[in-house]
Amino acid sequence: VHPDSSLHCVDGRWLLALYCVIPLSFIVVALDTLVLQRTLLHGLLPDDPNDWALWALLFGLPHIIASALTLSDRDYLRHYRWRLLPASLVFLLVCLAGWYGPQPLSYQLLFVFFAGFTVFHVLSQQLGIALVLSGRRPGRLFRLWKWAAIFAGMAIYLMVYGGQYLGRVQLAGIDGYRLFALLAGCFCAALILLTWQLARDCEERLGRWFIWANGLLLISAFAINELGYTLLVILMPRLIHDLTAFSVYITHDRNRQVRTSAGWLYRWLPSNGMTPFVVLPAASILIAWLLNSYQQHAFIGIAILLISFMHYYWEGFVWRGESPLRQHVRFRR
């Protein structure tokens, strides 16, 4: 535990517990296959959890909004302005080109770029936390593990969403989705070996479990997708990633409020540890709901894309080392 008793820590055991969604997903698949004759798959479960109104309200965009609210402090914006401003212009041009360029090619290219950035962001977060909980620096083995996971994740992502956004894909006369499945299988096989080697070298027990949890997340996603349960493939990483992100943002806001000064979101609210726990998710969900309600309008749709790209971008550096934000977040191993 950090020596400052006023500092709240993100509990690594809680983050590891989120991965229980993996065995629970296999239990659902087993029950549906062996007992219910796939009634859930063919009759009750949608292909995408976003078809559930409550899920669409709580997951996806809200954690991106929460990240923006946490970063929108005046001191942080002043500190990072020369990294954020040029990037925002570049990503705005990417969004406009994808939205208004020659169709369907422009939107398909935008999808591939978005898919790659999404997978890179999600896995960089989860694998980075594995590194923190392991108490080690990123070496050659970790980098191999990370990129095997990213390539596996990208292939799985294209298998899940490609039909919706790309349509039929043929590569050198070969069905593209069969090729994606082959690539995902090969990278998952490599991931098993790399995960075993990385976990073996880890001295921290919690870090070792977290390394295995992340390796198994991708392997499980590939296996469950091959069984046809697309909903669970989307649900597992989304639930883990979003709840992990909210845990970090709430911890940051609480510690900053208690130790230094409250951000603009909390300035007129009671100064106690529970305020960010309630206010940040509530404000994020409300703003995300408003944006999603009007996303059919080009301006709102582009705004959602832009803030998503910017979220992926700034999350790559604002929590590294002893950055201004990272000073308010510690992990308990």
Protein language model annotation of sequence segments:
Residues 1-59, 306, 316-317:
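N-terminal signal-anchor module of multipass membrane proteins
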Residues 7, 71-82, 104, 132-142, ...:
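Membrane-interface helix-boundary motifs at transmembrane edges
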Residues 13-30, 86-94, 148-154, 282:
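Alpha-helical transmembrane segments
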Residues 31-36, 124-128, 152-170, 194-198, ...:
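C-terminal ends of transmembrane alpha-helices
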Residues 51-71, 120-126:
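Central hydrophobic cores of alpha-helical transmembrane segments in multi-pass inner-membrane proteins
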Residues 127-131, 236-259:
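Predominantly late transmembrane helices and immediately cytosolic-facing juxtamembrane segments
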